[in-house]
Amino acid sequence: MKSIRIYIFMLGMLMAFAGCQTDFVKPLENDSEAPAPVRDVTYVKMPGSVLLTYTLPSDPDLLYVAASYTNKEGKKYEFKASYFTNTLLVEGFGDMDTYSLDVYAVDRSENYSAPVNIQVSADTPPVQAAYETLEVQPDFGGMTFSFANTSRADL
């Protein structure tokens, strides 16, 4: 009885070690041809974000459109939208400065097109607009904070 338990334990350990291997995630298709870039890129200012509108290339291998920018701290942000739509929402602008935004078309083999560079600037971020209306009042055992979130954004 004790030897059966040992054999079952050893078999379980053998299965656990045999199952541990590195899986490499890579695209199913593999070509080296990049898609054509997106065209006619325009944007609309929104509170703390911009909404890009573009014309998709007529590549049947197209998978998504990506846009990336680097903030003032040097952190790079990338946003993606499916090829089923021609708009892309880029969020996270903490101020109203001008940023350089690169827009790419990406195919099923993860080949990026040549970048389309545009200069964008967003409206006042929702957090900053809410901070300007912040009121602090004394209350029993503490304070009461109130503010107006006119853009109804997630703060």
Description of each model-found segment:
Residues 39-45, 132-137:
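Short beta-strand segments of immunoglobulin-like
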Residues 120-155:
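A charged, solvent-exposed segment within the mature domains of Sec-exported extracytoplasmic proteins
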Residues 21-33, 107-130:
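Extracellular fibronectin type III
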Residues 43, 47-60, 141-154:
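Conserved aromatic anchor
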Residues 63, 88-118, 155:
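Beta-strand-rich modules
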Residues 77-84:
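Short beta-strand segments within Ig-like beta-sandwich modules, predominantly Fibronectin type-III
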Residues 2-3, 12-42:
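Bacterial Sec-dependent N-terminal signal peptides
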